[in-house]
């Protein structure tokens, strides 16, 4: 089937006035290949050229004024090819001096008694405006050239095309295209939305702020609705082929295992286990996200599920993003299972004969549980009968990597885990097809981490506080943003310099260094020494952000903390507070921006990862929250997942109703269905 367009044009781009082969090349650099692409190339922002009352204008602000010329323009030249044009306007009985630099040609355009509109910076004291643009009115009415003066669209452009040119070309295209409605009359009426014709014309050429808001709302809903149609359709397709073998686990053995644990499960952990067990008994594959704050006990929940699979005769796999984390998981699971399960570790460091034996044991079923990095998805890793695949910190893996692991078994159940609590808005979008279990309770006996913020000049005082903890027999982390010094970031501390400084302060043998450039063996050696209390202070980059578990560590210093986002800071902070001892986190930062100050303030106010994730999303946006490529999110042109989260929920409900009821597959939705199928359904946003 040919590509289905919802916007159709009788012309190609080359047939539009003003577009030749050179312009085509520039447009293609902007990813504009067809007239449809041009019409959907929306402005990134709007210049508000609304004429302002000078009595209300703030000093040194950018304003737009309209007045009558009462002195002839005068041009003075100075320097090398520089000029200054001066003209006086009467603006509502206020005499205003207008200055235009390096625009001498305006002298021929500006006439006495002419009404003009000027945009520029206002000097209230001098009653003077430094103009950067002027619009000419013809006998008191706006010319076509100035038709967009009030709300002027601004597009992302490249060298070879000007704003006015792309505006004119879009105006041409809109006059000739046929626009098929993307939403039904029923939906538009239900949510008071506009037609797509009105919406696109208004987004490109708004006549008022009110019209622009209505158009933006309609287009945002449309984007979210199309995205959710895709998500719901994929979900339907996946479930239709998601037949699974019921996992007939031995509940008595599972209960006995839980009773033998050296601690009592929290209610949140029990609830999550029950939700997962219900999925395992269902006739379709499990797709569940288990999210919990740092230290909330997700690994124990995973362990119980793995044990259940073992009692049913199935293997389990756990894939994590780093070797350090894989080793820690393997160590903790071996301790939990004892002799009841055969746990193996597979990373890139496992080679030769050891790897060969491990793979043989995996294929013949001797290994019950395999833990590892992306090494698990290699072709020669063959399971005997894997029934459960768990991916930890799943947003750090691409969709393809996660899918390859899942395909290791014919009817494998899938559990994703994350210690980065997903904001509700992103959970709906990225994991809309999954069920979500959340652990918001910390294990009994844990004390909230005391977080404080200190300026750089207070470093010595922080060092004394850390020394006090070390004297109690505790351990500490010191985190830096850089491995080595950078000429571009001279004011940012680097981990090597701080490591050497602390070695002089505490002694060489008491301080360890960890960063991403070390080999796997070197990292293992350092972590082993820290875990065994051979090292008191670990100086590190964010390589310790996830999973590292040393209960005796009770102090964390994060240097240049304003260089990190809220979620990263919270993950780092979660490396302490993993015992019943009081833990401390000190943020050393002298932020120069409002955002940096806000992050430091928020971190000292709450230790709730779910609250922090929402604030982080608000501050950074969805693309930066996960990293654009890993988020699974499309680049919405108008919709904003933070501002439009209620709209997202409505769009999801409407899409789910259409797909699940089967109405979407009737003739009424034929055009829209073909569009989603041909343009969106199998598109990867990864």
From Swiss-Prot:
Plays a critical role in recombination and DNA repair. Helps process Holliday junction intermediates to mature products by catalyzing branch migration. Has replication fork regression activity, unwinds stalled or blocked replication forks to make a HJ that can be resolved. Has a DNA unwinding activity characteristic of a DNA helicase with 3'-5' polarity. One of its GO terms (biological process) is DNA recombination. This is ATP-dependent DNA helicase RecG. Belongs to the helicase family. RecG subfamily. One of its GO terms (molecular function) is DNA binding. Disruption phenotype: Increased sensitivity to ciproxoflacin. Coiled coil: none annotated.
